[in-house]
């Protein structure tokens, strides 16, 4: 046995086929609940569920999901650590059955945990996913289809030159900065199905996606983006960092006078709120805890003073409730206040369970206000 083989890690998990058969055949009540997808009535003017999206609609146009018992599933993955030091990193592979009503499918009993990849370091997910994908391919071709798999698009990370999963647009560095990359426009060329099938390192796709062999594969549409990481942990955390610059030692949000000098225009930073004011806001947050119902899970602490252990949902609450009520009025200029308010409003709309065409138009308009303001700074 060679060294590589002796260090191989083995993953054991349930068979997807057996799990679906158990759900479909052993419980009549559960079987009736699974008819939600087949009976779903779509309103073209409203987005309420996965079944309103382009990926599922394209699949219907291709003749897929014609049987009432066809099962739609989606895969999620996320990394986590088991201790505060983060010495062991694991990845969870999670399956959600979309046939259940959106009002109940998020309950734990409707989820299937397929695998947890072993540590101590972040493992190569491809090797662990291949058996699962092989089984999904068998189910797809021999009995049933899958509408979406949210995993491993092969697109370069967000710090790279072409970070977007959906469009081909080169990121740029801020003026007088050698680090940090941003997408300044929203009119980039959309990525194609062929780029995902064959790869294109020169345009930010390192290789063909391991999902490309599935008949349901639709390139960028296959890789969904969920709100936990994009809005809460992404936008919420970024907004927190932008507004608490005086409470930290970071200078990355200040305009740099010269790339070779450590001179920053702190006074002209549009979202500046002084440290003392932010600390007072943190105390106000702490004082409101006694008014929170005991049935609420978790605790909302003074995030200004301590962020250790802060969850994505806490950054989400900070953005949606603390920023507009306690912080916006402390920002110096009316234009900057409006930009932050519109950003928060856009994120709030995006988090709604149901979106109309008017909602989408308002959301786009809100984000445009913030982006225009940011591009002028």
Task: Tell me the role of every PLM-derived stretch.
Residues 55-59, 65-66, 71-119, 169, ...:
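Acidic, metal-ligating active-site segments
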Residues 335-377:
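Alpha-helical bundle/repeat cores within regulatory domains of eukaryotic proteins
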Residues 65, 69, 156, 277, ...:
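Secondary-structure capping and boundary motifs in well-ordered enzyme cores
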Residues 82-85, 118-125, 309-312, 330-334, ...:
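Conserved, non-catalytic sequence blocks in retroelement Pol enzymes and Pol-derived host proteins
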Residues 86-90, 107-109, 126-130, 152-154, ...:
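Short coil/turn segments at secondary-structure boundaries
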Residues 4-89:
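Structured nucleic-acid-interacting core domains from mobile-element enzymes and related host factors
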């Amino acid at each position: 046995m060679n060294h590589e083989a002796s260090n191989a890690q083995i993953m054991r998990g349930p068979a997807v086929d057996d799990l679906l058969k158990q759900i479909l055949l052993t419980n009549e009540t559960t079987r009736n609940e699974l008819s939600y997808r087949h009976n779903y009535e779509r309103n073209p003017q409203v987005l309420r569920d996965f079944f309103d999206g382009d990926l599922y609609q394209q699949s219907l146009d291709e003749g897929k999901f014609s049987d009432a018992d066809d099962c739609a599933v989606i895969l999620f993955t996320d990394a986590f650590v088991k201790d505060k030091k983060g010495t062991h990193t694991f990845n969870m592979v999670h399956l959600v059955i979309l046939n259940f009503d959106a009002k109940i499918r998020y309950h734990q009993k409707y989820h299937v945990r397929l695998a947890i990849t072993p540590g101590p370091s972040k493992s190569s997910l491809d090797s662990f996913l291949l058996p699962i994908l092989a089984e999904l391919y068998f189910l797809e071709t021999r009995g049933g289809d899958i509408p979406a798999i949210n995993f491993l698009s092969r697109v370069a990370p967000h710090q790279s030159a072409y970070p977007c999963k959906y469009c081909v647009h080169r990121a740029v560095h801020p003026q007088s900065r050698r680090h940090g990359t941003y997408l300044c426009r929203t009119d980039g060329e959309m990525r194609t199905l062929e780029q995902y099938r064959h790869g294109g390192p020169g345009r930010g796709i390192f290789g063909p996606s391991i999902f490309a062999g599935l008949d349901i594969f639709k390139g960028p549409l296959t890789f969904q983006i969920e709100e936990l990481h994009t809005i809460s942990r992404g936008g919420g955390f970024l907004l927190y960092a932008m507004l608490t610059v005086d409470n930290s030692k970071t200078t990355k949000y200040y305009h740099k006078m010269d790339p070779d000098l450590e001179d920053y225009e702190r006074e002209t930073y549009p979202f500046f709120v002084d440290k003392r004011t932010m600390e007072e806001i943190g105390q106000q947050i702490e004082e409101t805890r006694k008014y929170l119902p005991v049935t609420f899970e978790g605790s909302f602490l003074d995030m200004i003073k301590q962020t250790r252990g802060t969850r994505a949902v806490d950054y989400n609450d900070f953005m949606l409730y603390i920023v507009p009520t306690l912080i916006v009025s402390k920002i110096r200029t009316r234009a900057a206040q409006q930009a932050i308010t519109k950003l928060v409003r856009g994120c709030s709309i995006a988090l709604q369970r149901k979106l109309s065409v008017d909602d989408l138009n308002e959301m786009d308009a809100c984000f445009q206000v913030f982006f225009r303001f940011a591009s002028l700074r």
